[in-house]
From Swiss-Prot:
It holds the Pfam family Endonuclea_NS_2. PANTHER family: RIBONUCLEASE YQCG-RELATED (PTHR34976), TYPE VII SECRETION SYSTEM PROTEIN ESSD (PTHR34976:SF2). This is Type VII secretion system protein EssD. One of its GO terms (cellular component) is extracellular region. It comes from the Bacteria. Residues 423-435 have a biased composition (Basic and acidic residues).
Amino acid sequence: MTKDIEYLTADYDNEKSSIQSVIDAIEGQDFLDVDTTMDDAVSDVSSLDEDGAISLTSSVVGPQGSKLMGYYQNELYDYASQLDSKMKEIIDTPFIEDIDKAFKGITNVKLENILIKNGGGHGRDTYGASGKIAKGDAKKSDSDVYSIDEILKSDQEFVKVIDQHYKEMKKEDKKLSKSDFEKMMTQGASCDYMTVAEAEELEEQKKKEEAIEIAALAGMVVLSCINPVAGAVAIGAYSAYSAANAATGKNIVTGRKLSKEERIMEGLSLIPLPGMGFLKGAGKSLMKLGFKGGEKFAVKTGLQKTMQQAVSRISPKMGMMKNSVLNQSRNFAQNTHVGQMLSNMRGQATHTVQQSRNWIGQQAQNVKRIVNNGLDKEIAHPFKQQLAPAGMGGIKFAETTTLRNMGQNIKRAVTPQNHVTHGPKDSMVRSEGKHSISSHEMNSSKYVESPNYTKVEFGEHYARLRPKKLKANIEYTTPTGHIYRTDHKGRIKEVYVDNLSLKDGDRNSHAQRTVGGEDRLPDDDGGHLIARMFGGSKDIDNLVAQSKFINRPFKEKGHWYNLEKEWQEFLNSGKEVKNIKMEVKYSGNSQRPTIFKVEYEINGERNIRRILNK
């Protein structure tokens, strides 16, 4: 049985967003292509300048920009390359060392040496209601002291449970005798603990004939419980952990409150039933505690089921014994050596996570500072504007500028805002005041897998937030086969449809009224990226804030509406609409798109539409 310990990852997710913000700072400013872009812009402007009134020249800037980007990439690489070693140094190693210390005091406990003393009950049963672990000079021969062997065999219900587990083990080892099994259970050692260092050494020596399966990985602590039944008693009933969990109602390592069902299971750990009582139910990922029995003694099936069934079979006297141990456990957890170690471990985990948060935050700030300083450093302007009475919108260039501003000026110079747009080289069209540009090219934009996005199941693509929000940097596929990707802020970034078809879809009026949040404009609709008539999702995983002037059939506008109707007509006429790729662009942190780029094929002919969201 394997249980995990989970570290909260929110801080690390935030740092991922911090890194992405650095990338955003230079997004669209690929200086390696600046020279080519400017040459194209000059050529396109000249082709439209019939009276020759515009003169625009530029000097080479690619090498400077390339050098800066190379420096940025090196800095980011150095930062990322240190993460693994730093995580091991400040989280994995201290945690593993504390685990080693904690187990040092509770391993190899001989069960035959554990005695239970009758604390003076009310005479209603054999053991009394205040039985506790015997200390000091208690002897097995004393009339009020009982051994584990005596307790186990005192009740026929427990004998039946033991018999059941013997039969399970017998399936794994036909030669296992009943007497050997009983001896192992009542006189064996609690468990053998192997440190990570020892496990790695053993792995190197390949002593498979002596070793129990070991996964010696960074951040993984492996326990080898030779005797699962004995381990349940020693680590469950007579260490502080499970007793304290059941008594206090929370996990003493993580502080997480236990449900009623979990407390019942923790209580069952206090009686001699097979189960691993230490550090169970502590979460998922990062640190793993693997409890694995040896090949001879492993009970591979039925343990949990048997434990659950045993609830109704606990005899009254053993139930009272269990309650007594629970009552003793609060002080035991706080005052014993093991209890103190566990408490220290919890504090150490909190401390190391805080250390890592501080270190990662500092490194991210260093990277951002280096890049921003470079982008904002003033340089002599490479562009010389001689005359711009028309076409370029009267953009003014200062004597000096920064690389950041330079990129923004270039971007403004070649966008369709001033009725001039730079599309594919074989097609240059005048927008005539419209917000939709169409062209054709041979390149296909079929879906290609990317390592930059985490694939999640449909239904797992929402973050646990209110209001509802998509997870960041993920890829999900709807039941109709439409593929979506989100950016670092959980905004829909790309949509892919292999083969469009007509299907009926539902509507979510609330989502359509609220999508876009505070960035939504009064004239916005909740627009479907893939329309309902094509089986598009009704929820925010397919909705964006979209201007009603493109989403509805307005005269001279309605570009998005017209595109959907065009697809519908093609499909109704028997034509194929395939290999759709939508790119949704945003400005800054806004949840409202600024432009949509839609590529698709009609009977093999490639089309591109760029639609401004206004």
